[in-house]
Every structure is written in C-alpha cells, then in structure tokens.
Design a protein with these regions (language model features):
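Conserved beta-strand elements of beta-rich interaction domains across eukaryotes
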Residues: 28-31, 93, 129, 156
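Glycine-rich loops and low-complexity Gly/Arg-rich segments
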Residues: 48-51, 80-84, 110-113, 147-150, ...
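Short C-terminal domain-edge/linker segments immediately following a structured domain
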Residues: 53-58, 115-120, 153-158
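Active-site-proximal C-terminal subdomain of hydrolase catalytic domains
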Residues: 130-174
C-alpha cells in the first residue's frame, strides 16, 4: 500500500542548522490512496521555513500501514536517530487510537514497537485526547523505550492544536 509521503524541508535553513532535530509525522486518513491538502502539512512546511526543522510526513489508514510506515523509518532510514519527535495526528480516545473505525490500545501499539522508540518523544495532536493513567504511560515508555509521550487533555473538532504543536516542536531547536 502506498501512502502520501513528503519530505518537508527548507534547504537553505537545513544546511545552516546547528542541531539535527527532525519530526516524523504520521497522520491517519480515511484512504491513503486519496491525496488531500492537510493543515498539518502546511504547518510542517512553515516550521521548516521559519525554524529550520525538517520533517517527513506520511499518512496511514490501517494498523498495518502505521506499522509499515514506522518500520520503514526504523529500518530503512539511516537518519532515524535524528528523528527526535514522532508526531501522531489521529483520532482516538483515552488509551486508544482509531484507524478506519478500528480502535487499538496504546498497549497494543507499544507491543508492536517494543524497544524500537528508544529516546523518542511521541506527541499526539489534539484530534486524539491523551488520557492515560500513570501506569499506562509508564508501561508505554518502558515497553517502547520512548523518552516521553505527550498530547492534550481535550480535543476540539473546530480548533486544531497545530499552532501549539509547532511551538512545542520549536522548543527542541533552542
């Protein structure tokens, strides 16, 4: 299955960057075969242009395409260590994500990527409320090796978190 794949970078700024912070963004869509202009892509482009933070943007519509995208990043991208932030833009509630009307718990996701997210920060956009107990969060971090998991306590169908997410990401460049 192919998916939307874009490398977002402003080359002039990338060449002069002191740090190697990159963002890998994975957005859930109804059908990866249908290309649509996403607000997320526009915001990542602005982040690259203004802050010099490059990113890779992909879409997924099933748990298999999510796993395939992250495995491609893990095993085929020799710069994976530079991707400090894994940015997930998908629906869900509490301890689950939703892909094409199927719900997966973060425990299931953790087990798929057991030990593979060492040192990464997983950040969820506000389209998915991140409502985890301390034990659930610690389990996810312990199993995946991730450094942190972050997100929002409320979602909004009328207002996205893109601007706040952009500010959050820019903190890693300072």
């Amino acid at each position: 299955m192919c998916s939307t794949f874009q490398i977002i970078a402003h080359l002039h700024k990338l060449n002069s960057m002191d740090s190697d912070t990159f963002i890998f963004c994975l957005e859930a869509v109804a059908d990866i075969e249908t290309e649509t202009a996403s607000e997320v892509v526009k915001n990542l482009e602005q982040l690259a242009f203004k802050q010099g933070i490059a990113s890779i943007y992909k879409t997924c519509d099933t748990i298999e395409s999510l796993e395939e995208s992250l495995n491609t990043l893990l095993y085929d991208d020799h710069n994976f260590k530079n991707y400090e932030i894994i940015y997930l833009v998908m629906q869900g509630e509490g301890n689950t994500i939703c892909l094409n009307e199927y719900y997966y718990t973060l425990e299931e996701i953790a087990e798929i990527f057991e030990g593979k997210m060492k040192g990464k920060i997983l950040h969820f956009a506000n389209s998915k409320v991140l409502d985890l107990s301390n034990d659930e969060a610690q389990y996810f971090l312990d199993v995946t090796g991730a450094r942190a998991i972050s997100g929002y306590g409320t979602s909004s169908s009328t207002l996205t978190s893109s601007i706040l997410d952009t500010l959050f990401f820019s903190l890693f460049e300072e």
